[in-house]
Amino acid sequence: MRLTQGCFSFLPDLTDTQIEKQVAYAMNKGWAMNVEWTDDPHPRNNYWELWGLPLFDIKDPATVMFELNEARKSCASGYIRINAFDASYGVESCVMSFITNRPATEPGFYLDRTEGPGRQVIYSIKSYSVQANPEGSRY
């Protein structure tokens, strides 16, 4: 099951040339960039691990592409995404985020039902990869 988070998630994977064009677009808007990675694909997992430092005031897309390629070398079997932040309104907020790297296989999710008090049924979504393997060895 393909993880669909962020921009372009329903499209085929972006090539490096397309990623570089999106990074250039964000830089032309004056947005700060960063690279993040995770091996926990849960839809509500918004807190991915930051790769390196945030890239403020970067003028060349090659810098972001270098960081992306370094993250790919180290975290090749997980998810990697690029975020762009707009601080022009005085509040830093993410305005663009897209996945640039995925595991070879994405096992998907299952629905877990738990009986609560009375007739209450509690539903939760869990990842097959998280259930089967500990953190750091999921893909």
Curated annotation (Swiss-Prot):
One of its GO terms (cellular component) is chloroplast. Its main location: plastid. It is found in: Plastid, Chloroplast. InterPro entries: RuBisCO_ssu, RuBisCO_ssu_dom, RuBisCO_ssu_sf. It comes from the Eukaryota. The keyword Plastid applies. GO terms for molecular function: ribulose-bisphosphate carboxylase activity. Keywords: Calvin cycle, Carbon dioxide fixation, Chloroplast, Photorespiration, Photosynthesis, Plastid. GO terms for biological process: reductive pentose-phosphate cycle. PANTHER family: RIBULOSE BISPHOSPHATE CARBOXYLASE SMALL CHAIN 1, CHLOROPLASTIC (PTHR31262), RIBULOSE BISPHOSPHATE CARBOXYLASE SMALL SUBUNIT (PTHR31262:SF23). Heterohexadecamer of 8 large and 8 small subunits. In this alga, in contrast to plants, the small subunit is encoded in the chloroplast. The basic functional RuBisCO is composed of a large chain homodimer in a 'head-to-tail' conformation. In form I RuBisCO this homodimer is arranged in a barrel-like tetramer with the small subunits forming a tetrameric 'cap' on each end of the 'barrel'. Belongs to the RuBisCO small chain family. RuBisCO catalyzes two reactions: the carboxylation of D-ribulose 1,5-bisphosphate, the primary event in carbon dioxide fixation, as well as the oxidative fragmentation of the pentose substrate in the photorespiration process. Both reactions occur simultaneously and in competition at the same active site. Although the small subunit is not catalytic it is essential for maximal activity. This is Ribulose bisphosphate carboxylase small subunit. It comes from Thalassiosira nordenskioeldii (Marine diatom).
